[in-house]
Curated annotation (Swiss-Prot):
Catalytic activities: Mo-molybdopterin + GTP + H(+) = Mo-molybdopterin guanine dinucleotide + diphosphate
Cofactor: Mg(2+)
Transcription regulation is among the record's keywords: no
Protein family per UniProt: Belongs to the MobA family.
Subcellular location: Cytoplasm
Name of this protein: Probable molybdenum cofactor guanylyltransferase
Any one annotated GO CC term: cytoplasm
Amino acids binding Mg(2+): D92
Organism: Thermococcus gammatolerans (strain DSM 15229 / JCM 11827 / EJ3)
Residues that bind GTP: L6, A7, G8, K18, D67, D92
Length: 191
């Protein structure tokens, strides 16, 4: 399965390009990529980026696919699925847990559903830490044509496989940690 790392976003809250911000000499996005590489069920890693970011990200040595839609996460997922089924993760999730990725992919394949998404007890979804079938792209295309860019709404409409987060190993939850501000980097150093 493809491991698609979304490298969109403008880093407004962070105050710059957070994905290339260096932590201990290494760009933030590389922490996510390196953890994803150790997931056993990932065959290939691609980066989904805007045209503006593509050249900078190509220097990391991974295949970069350009998201020309620029409509947020839905556009990134849509672009990734043009290459086949994919596990999609945001590039700012440096504590990604490879065993959790493998678990999601296994459950996705067992379920036969279009999407397999972790869900919190309160109903909140983790759509940028989920597995999708390339068939989900057709659903997204309809939404995009209609101007509806809410990824969670599209997911809910396809009767996905939900993974109840509270019933999974607690240590896997660090996988959802994402960096939005420079203060978050402090949490990363402590963790």
């Amino acid at each position: 399965m493809i491991g698609a790392v979304l490298a969109g976003g403008r880093g407004k809250r962070f105050g710059g390009d957070k994905l290339l911000y260096r932590i201990n000499g290494k760009p933030l996005i590389l922490y996510t990529i390196e953890r994803l590489e150790t997931a056993k069920k990932i065959d290939e890693i691609i980066l989904v980026a805007s045209k503006d970011n593509a050249e900078k990200l190509e220097k990391l040595g991974y295949r970069v696919v350009v998201d020309n839609l620029l409509i947020g996460p839905m556009g990134g997922v849509y672009t990734a699925l043009s290459l086949g089924d994919a596990f999609v993760v945001a590039g700012d999730m440096p504590l990604l847990v490879p065993e959790f990725v493998d678990f999601i992919i296994s459950e996705f394949k067992k379920s036969g559903k279009t999407a397999c998404v972790p869900r919190w007890e309160n109903g909140y979804l983790e759509p940028l830490h989920a597995a999708y079938s390339s068939a989900f792209r057709e659903v997204l295309e309809e939404k995009i044509k209609a101007g509806n860019y809410a990824l969670n709404r599209a997911i809910r409409e396809v009767n996905p496989c939900y993974l109840p987060i509270e019933s999974l190993p607690e240590e896997w939850r660090e996988s959802f940690f994402n960096v939005n501000t420079r203060e978050d980097l402090g949490k990363l150093h402590k963790g």
